[in-house]
Amino acid sequence: MNFHSLYDQGFARVAAVTLPVHPARPFENAREIIDTARELDARGVAVGVYPELCVSGYAIDDLLLQDVLLDTVEKALGSIVEASADLLPLLIVGAPLRKDNALCNCAVAIHRGRVLAIIPKSHLPNYREFYEKRYFVTMPPRACERIEVPWGGVEEFSGGPVWVPFGQVLLSADDVPGLTVGIEICEDMWVPVTPATELALAGATVLANLSASPITVGRGADRELMVRSVSARCSAAYIYTAAGIGESSTDLAWDGETMIYEAGERLAIGERFQEGAHITIADVDLERLRTERKRQNSFTDNAQRYFAGDERLSPQEVEITLDPPRTDLGLERAVNRFPFVPNDPTRLEQDCYEAYNIQVAGLVQRLRAIGNPKIVIGVSGGLDSTHALVVASRAMDLLGRPRTDILCYTLPGFATSERTKTNATLLCQYLGTSFQEIDIRPAATQMLADIGHPYGEGEATYDVTFENVQAGLRTDYLFRLANHLGGIVLGTGDLSELALGWCTYGVGDQMSHYAVNTGVPKTLMQHLIRWVVASKQFDDRVGEVLLSILHTEISPELVPAKPGEKMQSTQDKIGPYNLQDFTLYHVLRRGARPSKIAFLAEKAWSDASVGSWPVGFPEEDKVAYSLEEIVKWERLFLWRFFSQQFKRSALPNGPKVMAGGSLSPRGDWRMPSDVSGADWVAELDEAVKGLVD
């Protein structure tokens, strides 16, 4: 395996091509196709999709019925077949072809000097500007037969003319796992039950649409809606290309739109109304698509119901060997640094609005269901407890209850800083909650002495026991206060901490009566608090404190810092949340292999100047990570993720927030508490052998 090879990492490079059309000049069009095919080959493309009827031109009307044109189309196709002999890509081009005494609007699949299959258009539009039934016929639904193609290359064994499948087919690469291509043509995408749907249910992971599609105002957005929808519903990649410059403008105009979607996400879109040939390239994640279908068992159920055991309904399969380059070709797709945080400002604002209100709605329902008790919460002046408190405040407002029913406690320990304690105090004061400070140091010192810990005898020993005595006492106080005052303890820990087991089990911050933050990753938490400030959920005084908290080092504040040293840092211990949330998303939502996560992380994080950052992200925090750093922290993530499952197995109730998933043992993530992650670490180490120490 080559760690830096996109093909070895489960991707395939695909392209949508639009080119200058020469109406009724097949050899000129073939030349354009061959020229772009050579460029696709040079760029390591596995599948290249061209527009509908690109060999002849689409808008040539009754010339489509002229034998002179059709004879020339076949000869031009023969020249494309011949030129493809030494080229990598599977080429899918559009042409009018005779079948018996009829004419079909076809896609022709060509690879390495052979015609692999011919796919006729299933649905012919005959309304508004379209009159395709004047020229073409359709084939019986799902029918597939074999026809002789004299121009289709040479049969490998007989040396005679080629007989190829004619109808619905699946084109599968035997050396690129998961690359199975299904083809439909233009109008096929616009009908209620599309050929693409049938092809996806039969196993196609990559769907190609050869389109002509003249442009009118708004049609570009309509196309994109359809492509996105099909790719999302079918858990597939979708390659779309439309006819462009050169098509007849007698009554219509053409924009040459190209786009590539994957499972509802846009990977690439081409500029419209361009002169000359235009190639839109993206690397589709085949492993992601296969994993998504495995996870969504209803996809397989739907396929079984649709085909119902009748093999005659299934497309014919054609197998090819691509032999793609296993070298570093880069990666032709954007990889989000923060997969839980969208870069688009409008989408980020919407996500924050929904996340915040999901948390509030979950807490409101729980309070109503159990008789509207008071809320007991420990407020440290850190991100998580701060956000839990603002969620609780909003919940009380919706319930029509006074915020004084939120009983806030700050519980300073041996390393609590003046800044965090001040912020906690001011936040509670400005929100109008009940507030009390309980110094846990005397009780912690006594407990350490009682158990014979060196600190109890005056020795500066700051080990895990020293830390957990403080964490445990805080939780113990909160639960006893809840008992005493008729409340519930509101948990504050977040999704990232749960993944890493960065919490104290049982009598510690792992436990609460209800936990509002367990579905929120740390990297989103900061944006949520910014959104709370920007959207004026509370007054300006609260906003100022929230901004101060945002600029505070993330720390458990359990170990005192020596004079001149920096305070205890969570990220120094368990890794940057930037990287750990990246890994968490790809484990939880994508089911990706560790080596692939490292590959993607390097693409996302190796250069801070490349790619986009979420709106409002501080300039000073825009950092980069080397592959060595990425692998170091991913190893730690894997070790902690497996070894700390026992904490998640006893997770309190709390709402799922992110589509990226949750770690609730009753929901998205079910895993034994006593398994080892050694094989996952070994897979990572084997892949990066020789690249990092």
Give each language-model segment a name.
Residues 29, 177-179, 234-236, 245-248, ...:
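ATP/NTP-dependent adenylation/nucleotidyl-transfer catalytic domains that generate, transfer
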Residues 1-378, 394-403, 435:
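Enzyme catalytic cores with a strong preference for nitrogen-chemistry domains
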